[in-house]
Amino acid sequence: MRRLVSSAFAATVAVFARRAVVGALVVLTALCVAVEAQAETPLRRPLSFLPAASVLVVTPGAANVVERVMQVSPYLAPQADTLTAHSARAFRRLAARQPDLARCSADTLARLFLVTGEAHIAAALDRERLRRDSLLSANPTDRSAAQALLNTLGWVAASEGTDLYVNLPVDCMINVATPALRCTVDQIREMGRVKYRLSGFPQHGSALRLHLRLPAGVEPDQVFLNGRRLLAPQIERGYLVVDRAWRNNEELYYDLPERKQLFGE
């Protein structure tokens, strides 16, 4: 009798153990699928880069990209990366395959960013910007190198509706003039601090979802809005998102870690 009870008990335990293992596997699989889906899900509507002409570079002296390019030729003009409806579908499919970004051309990276809004793709564009900057420094009269560097101003910011993305660490004034947004964002680096000062809104303010790509070593809870630390900061696709009704001269800032390069990876 005891053997029968023991056998029945052991069988029951085994059944529950199997169910627990299966349940855990189901949950783990669901989590993996959810993470993968999130990483591969394109934006509902693709972004558009703001025109390079809307980015006024204010970096002083020889570090000013526009001044360096104009010394090569005053006739150079930035070339924009855009998407058609057909190419947007193609790049959505490419994004779903999660290509090796290190092997992608700059044009491909730019369009992948427009369909995904992913911060790690913007980081790859920033590395390309630095590479082009180095090429022009090594060949300061090279027209092709100057054109390539000038084109990177078209990657500084992007928008869709009331979403505005600030992607590259360029000291500049970004003049936003789209059907849904009209404002100015001053991106300033001074004394180890990065500031974003917003203005140009109507008197009553305006709704704006501001997406900021933070540098390595800066945590979202280290960002301050109008002098107060952000509470429960929101992260989407690697960007810090500040979604609110903005008024003129409001300001975000964070301090850079010591001995860290801006947006270092």
Question: What do these predicted regions represent?
Answer:
Residues E40-L214:
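Aromatic (Trp/Tyr) and acidic
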Residues F224-R228:
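Short strand-turn-strand beta-turns centered on an Asx-Gly dipeptide
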Residues R19-C32:
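Bacterial N-terminal signal peptides
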Residues G238-V242:
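Short strand-edge motifs at loop-to-beta-strand transitions and within beta-strands
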Residues L256-E265:
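Glycine/proline-rich low-complexity spacer/linker segments in large multi-domain proteins
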Residues L230-I235:
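Short beta-strand segments within Ig-like beta-sandwich modules, predominantly Fibronectin type-III
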Residues M1-A17:
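N-terminal secretory signal peptides that target proteins for export/translocation
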Residues L31-P42:
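Bacterial Sec-dependent signal peptides at the C-terminal "C-region" and cleavage site
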